[in-house]
């Protein structure tokens, strides 16, 4: 009889354990589901970001101009082409810019013509802007390429190291705004340095 009771109680315990294992979640399965959810969310976020990028490029395609060739190049034409590029790329009319030729560097196989573009926003309160941002343009004219080959154009922002190429990277006005805002914040932090006349 005790043997029958033991086997009956063993069966009851097995059934209790089976029922408990069905009602209690398995921690390994839960961790796996959490990891799977995280991967799925990351994937969905990447897809959404990519879709937003495609829509933005459809609405605002890369804007560029037809840059002059080696045979057409002059310093004055370089100034005009930079103006033309920005008139096509900059949508907000509040930005004022001026282009000036800085220098010509003679390298072994080419000449580098460097231009500086000043950016500022004038307002009714302050018609002459106290703060400006800048962009350095470099036009590379090769000594060895044929006259009908296009020149190589690149630009970098003030205090930046990343080189951009027109037609490959969209010029963003907020780069200039961020720089002018940072300069303005710096000037406000040290008014005793900048309020002198």
From Swiss-Prot:
User: Which UniProt keywords are listed?
Assistant: Cytoplasm
Chain intervals for the UniProt region annotation (Disordered): 1-29
Q: Which is one Gene Ontology cellular component term of this protein?
A: cAMP-dependent protein kinase complex
**Could you read off the lineage of the organism from its UniProt record?**
Eukaryota, Metazoa, Chordata, Craniata, Vertebrata
Tell me what organism the protein belongs to: Homo sapiens
Q: In which tissues is it expressed?
A: Present in cilia (at protein level). Expressed in tissues containing axoneme-based organelles (cilia and/or flagella): trachea and testis. Highly expressed in airway cilia.
Phenotype when changing residue 43 to P: Abolishes RII-binding
Can you state the subunit structure given in the record? Answer: Binds to type II regulatory subunits (RII).
Location of the protein in the cell: Cytoplasm
Q: Answer yes or no on keyword Cell inner membrane.
A: no
Q: What is its main location?
A: cytoplasm
Summarizing the function annotation, the protein's role is: Binds to type II regulatory subunits of protein kinase A and anchors/targets them.
The molecule here is called A-kinase anchor protein 14
Q: Which GO terms describe its molecular function?
A: protein kinase A regulatory subunit binding
- Where do the segments described as RII-binding lie? 35-52
Where are the compositionally biased (Polar residues) regions? 1-11, 19-29
